[in-house]
Amino acid sequence: MKYPEMTLATLAILKYPNALLRKKSIPVEIFDDNLHNFLDDMYETLIESKGVGLAAIQVGRAERILIINIPREEDKQQYKEDLLEIINPTFLTQEECVEWEEGCLSVPDFYESIKRFDKVSIAYKDRYGNDRILKAQGFLAVAIQHEIDHLNGVLFVDKLPILKRKKFEKELKKLKKESQA
């Protein structure tokens, strides 16, 4: 029997200040082909956007789903076999503070240092609903925290000190004026 070829879709990424980005995501309860197709579309979107992480809420779906694909050290390339699909994550441990420069697909062209934990461990489910535990450090730990923040309606710019936050708002207004000109 021949099956129709599956086509992947690139999803539209919501941009700040879209109000949906502030919505708290709900846990996933059904692990089926619809979820698998959505995860595949998220991956396609992540790669097309040249990002390292993407939360479902960033593409308009308020479920506790995120994906991360960190480029490899040796060649700075992303490989599908390194993809993490993380569903319904909860933190188990968080250790040692670090500052890391972050950016976000929903806040394009803005980067700033944010305080995060350098080491985390999380419990989560994979695409099939299997329980998993992940220990992460460095860039991966930071990316996990950034994406879980999205699931809770928090953006990295919310973590900026007040002066840096004002700088961000000023730059955003300037960009809006330029795009309307």
Swiss-Prot record:
Positions that bind Fe cation: 104, 146, 150
For this UniProt record, the keywords arranged alphabetically read as follows: Hydrolase, Iron, Metal-binding, Protein biosynthesis
**Cofactor note (record):** Binds 1 Fe(2+) ion.
What GO biological process term is on the record, naming one? translation
Cofactor(s) the protein requires to work:
Fe(2+)
Entry EC number(s) = 3.5.1.88
Which Gene3D superfamilies does the UniProt record give?
A: Peptide deformylase
Catalytic site: 147
MF terms in GO? metal ion binding; peptide deformylase activity
What is the top EC class of this enzyme, as a single word?
Answer: hydrolase
Keyword Cell inner membrane attributed: no
Catalyzed chemical reaction(s): N-terminal N-formyl-L-methionyl-[peptide] + H2O = N-terminal L-methionyl-[peptide] + formate
Cross-referenced Pfam families: Pep_deformylase
InterPro entries in the cross-refs? Peptide_deformylase (IPR023635), Peptide_deformylase_sf (IPR036821)
HAMAP family assigned to the protein according to its UniProt record, in alphabetical order? Pep_deformylase
Its function? Removes the formyl group from the N-terminal Met of newly synthesized proteins. Requires at least a dipeptide for an efficient rate of reaction. N-terminal L-methionine is a prerequisite for activity but the enzyme has broad specificity at other positions.
- Family affiliation: Belongs to the polypeptide deformylase family.
Name the chain's protein.
Peptide deformylase
Natural source organism: Helicobacter hepaticus (strain ATCC 51449 / 3B1)
Q: What is the lineage of its organism?
A: Bacteria, Pseudomonadati, Campylobacterota, Epsilonproteobacteria, Campylobacterales
